From Swiss-Prot:
Post-translational modification: Contains 3 disulfide bonds.
Protein name in UniProt: Cliotide T11
GO biological process: defense response
Organism: Clitoria ternatea
Family to which the UniProt record says this protein belongs: Belongs to the cyclotide family. Bracelet subfamily.
Tissue and organ distribution: Expressed in seed but not in root, nodule, flower, stem, shoot, leaf and pod (at protein level).
Function: Probably participates in a plant defense mechanism.
Keywords linked to the UniProt accession: Disulfide bond, Knottin, Plant defense
UniProt keyword annotation of Protein biosynthesis present: no
InterPro entries per UniProt: Cyclotide, Cyclotide_bracelet_CS, Cyclotide_sf
Length: 31
């Protein structure tokens, strides 16, 4: 539930995905 500062509208989460973030509502979130 914490925004990671990366969007995933056109491409999936990349750098933040390494930190455990996942795509939700076009934004990368962690918990």
């Amino acid at each position: 539930g914490i925004p990671c500062g990366e969007s995933c509208v056109f491409i999936p989460c990349t750098i933040t995905a390494l930190l455990g973030c996942s795509c939700k509502d076009k934004v990368c979130y962690k918990n």
